[in-house]
Amino acid sequence: MLVRDFQRHVAQTSAAPLGLEIADARGSWLVDVRGRRYLDLLAGMGVANLGHGHPAIRRACAEQLRRYLHVMVYGELVLAPQVRLATRLTAVAGPPFETAYFTSSGAEAIEGALKTARKHTGRAGLVAFELGFHGDTLGALSIGGNRRYRAPFEPLLPQVTILPWNDVRALARVDRRVAAVVIEPVQAEGGVRVADTAFLRALRRRCSAVGALLVFDEVVTGLGRTGTLFAFQQSGVRPDLLVLAKALGGGLPLGAFLGSRRILATLARQPPLAHVTTFGGHPLSCAAAVAALDVTLARDLPTRAAAVGAILRRGLETLRARHRIVRDVRGVGLLIAIELGTPRATRRFAAACLERGVILNWTLHRDTVVRLAPPLTITRREVAHALGVIDAALHVAGRPA
């Protein structure tokens, strides 16, 4: 009955959702109403870095529930969870990040970053990259790198340029008409493609030379997934604005963009209230986020992601040698891709994993690439279990039709 009501009354985003009716979630596992357990290798699409239902997050939420929930639109009242989170985030991110603007989601944070860049620079041009994904709101979609998803909604924002990935020569098109260049240090929906350090450094130099703001979209990579707390720390390239979401809220809806006081102050004047949000930085979400950040740092989960990710990649490379259907294994930390030969094989592989109790899926812009982004707390035993299921599913996907 509930599945039928889900299909009838909850707006659908595809013709074939997973459709599992979930009764419980703990750690790396989801449990359906029949009691069957599923190993979640997507961490709720990169949200559950600490696993599902972490006790510290539950305690923080319970404590905040006893105090207050929403009390006023963003930016008017002093709310302790917001202040604590902004102080902690800017401290661990380091210069130039002095202040944080909180939102309800990653797409909303991207929208705020785009508005900030346009207002701060007085320019309209925006630059992004092929196969990039920054959200589905109108502005975020405008800088998306896959025309298949832009086309049904055009015309979108004007003066947007989409450049090829990792092409230093193409950066000459970033000129003094550009307000911002937006890039994911690792493209998630684009197939887990890692930006070259030399490319990011050249991009930083170009933005500085022409006065454009460099915006890093770390909605997926932020908070430890790549083996450092933020992916920009691996290249040493510091953006002007840093966009976070997904894992930031510890399972609750929360996004943010960080920058210097000078840049973000542009939203407070000429006119004042140039960018506002009702639910952005919700006290409950911020309380959960502080707890999540505390656990991430106390347990050094970025280092753990690097170590466990290396184990998972080695296991996948071993499977690659046994299964001709696997074309590539790549990634960083616990953001890993398995590239298969055809979209059909990819679908068969994902379905075979689900039948065996493992949840994963292909990326939005590369339908031959399966993404693995499990909780950073996944155990070595769970990794071994996942590799066994993946091995069996690759046998199924590799059989003749």
Enumerate the language-model features and the residues they cover.
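Conserved N-terminal phosphate-binding loop of PLP-dependent enzymes in the Aspartate aminotransferase
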Residues: 1-401
